[in-house]
Amino acid sequence: FVQFDFPDQNGKPYKSSGGKMVCNPELKREIPEGWGVEKLGDITICHDSKRVPLSSNDRELVKGKIPYYGATGIMDYVNDYIFDGDYVLMAEDGSVMTEKGTPILQRISGKNWVNNHAHVLEPVKNHSCKLLMMLLKDVSVMKIKTGSIQMKINQENMNKIVVPAIPLELLFEINQKLEVIDKQQLNLIEENKQLTQLRDWLLPMLMNGQVKV
């Protein structure tokens, strides 16, 4: 999809089959003819005001099975949640980008707690979380991040990120295909969480001899 080889009207890869591409000055790249651009702030709702950070001491008092997310991943598990739904997280400060200069993204679903080091984005206007991840994964954030030692992507700059605007009829088709992939990936993520929790519970008992193999 990000290489614009989605199925054309004949079911063939659009770009590879000679689909017309036009240069877009805002994106500084070619996009399919008929596509436009839109800002991230126009296709998402940012829920940053709902985030609540917990110190390590605070988290010790509320241990549970609900993931507690930071900028780059799950930091802990707690017994309560702030968010219950489907969201995309974008790292706000600390480690905010990959070695390629693209944003650090996480896809979360269900009950979760997110601290103040990751932006919480809910896609709107017929965009899905999976589609949003794909639109953002190759975007450079080099010019919008601030700071050199303690890097940060503030909400204002994040909302100005431009991404390709997909025609509505194609948007529905793409979302249908991505939904199947998204469900499979979420199932794998959930299985991995359960295995991680099992490991963290079992390993100390193996180390002190409570359990033998």
Feature names for model-found ranges:
Residues 59-60, 75, 98, 151-154, ...:
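Juxtamembrane/interface motifs at transmembrane-helix termini
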Residues 57, 78-79:
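A generic local secondary-structure boundary/capping motif
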Residues 11-19, 105-108:
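Short, compositionally biased low-complexity segments
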Residues 15-53, 58-70, 168-213:
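Non-catalytic DNA-recognition/assembly elements of restriction-modification systems
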Residues 30-33, 118-126, 141-143, 153-184:
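Proline-centric
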Residues 2-4, 9:
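Extended, domain-scale alpha-helical bundle/helix-rich regions
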Residues 70-74, 80-159:
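A short beta-sheet element
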Residues 1, 35-38, 63-66, 85, ...:
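Sequence-level motif detector for i,i+2 pairs with an aromatic at +2
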